Amino acid sequence: MVLMKETIPLFKVFMSPTAKDKAGEVLDSGYIGQGAKVDEFEKQIGNYFGNNKVVTTNAGTSALHLALHLLKKPKPHWNEDVFQGVAFVSHHWPGIEDGDEVLATPLTCTASNWPIVANNLKIKWVDIDPTTLNMCLKDLEKKMPRKTKAILGVHWGGYPLDLDKIRDIRSKFRGKYGWAPALIEDGAHAFGSKYKGKYLGNHNNFVMNSLQAIKHITSVDGGLLYCPHDELYERAKLLRWYGIDRNPKGRTDFRCEADIEEWGFKFHMNDVCAAIGMENFKHMDRLVSRHKENAAYYDLRLQNIEGVTLLKREKGFESAFWIYSLLVDDRASFYEYMKECNIMVSQVHERNDKHSCMAEFQTKLPNLEKTIGKVVSIPVGWWVSDEQRKYIVDCIRKWK
């Protein structure tokens, strides 16, 4: 087998050839803050995915922080219907308070879990399902005491969580206590993923997408928060920019004349990033389709290899395959071998629970312990050509 001279990267930034000019137009316009381009980008995203209650932010992490904040204990002046009709609540919803627990997976980027502690909440780790690397739903159900107020679930690699099973688990909880924990879906890997035929963001939960540099679509940096309810959406728009209502409503100066009823954050996207995001989003279908095509090729041709285990696939779970993960028995030698083949591979994310700042939340996670040393992701993105993906398969088949 002839080695490829150029290294096949695990990640690569996609930038539309028109993005530079569009960003330049904004830079030359004299207005580069949150404005018309942000509004246009949100409409573009909302129309495509079928949920117009989408809010752009400056990062996916900010979107998760905002979602948790929006679920905090209602203030007396809030509309009493703010949580009505939303899948995770009933009229008994108590709201999140400082010190409450959030169930979360440690197998993810730290950007998923740090917003939990930043909101003065406690993390309760849920073990992983080694067949998908998503949260183990049996363990989730075991770890839902009354003080659990939210679940932060990650769609690993873009492969959707079983949202129906999570709904059933939460329904049992609601039967006991009259309300159920909120579900926040971390879709940083899952831009364009579908569950049971519907894009993520349409299952009546908060959902975050990341627009960070190496994701399917980038705005240089940024995030999206899909909201499940009109009033939560309106609050999200306010709180991403200090709580200031940007709608003039007859005022001559909205900054100085508007009363701030609820303090907020500096989480907004600017028009430069939005302009870049819009240009890149025009290529979304082609890019995500290529990720899926390469993944399907691997699914077919990486079967029955000694020491290599493929992850589970189920009908109705349509991954956007930001990464393609598999389990390798002797990972150290696999890493070295793939490096010699000029193929970049990685675990991608370290388990969050072993960081020293997480010491107070330590617990036993047997599935993760057995699996973490085997997790490897191989190049699957839009940049991987037919020739390269064949080469990757050939190399893996000749390992050992």
State where each predicted segment sits.
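Short beta-strand-to-turn element immediately C-terminal to the catalytic PLP-Schiff-base lysine
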Residues: 209-210, 223-228, 278
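PLP-dependent aminotransferase-like
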Residues: 74-187, 194
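Buried hydrophobic packing segments
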Residues: 63-71, 116, 223, 277
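Conserved active-site segment immediately N-terminal to the catalytic lysine
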Residues: 179-219, 248, 256-261
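Conserved SAM-binding loop
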Residues: 56, 104, 125, 225, ...
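Structural detector of well-ordered beta-strand residues that form the stable sheet scaffold
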Residues: 55, 103, 124, 182-184, ...
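Conserved PLP-binding active-site segment in aminotransferase class I/II-type PLP enzymes
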Residues: 1-88, 95-97, 166, 296, ...
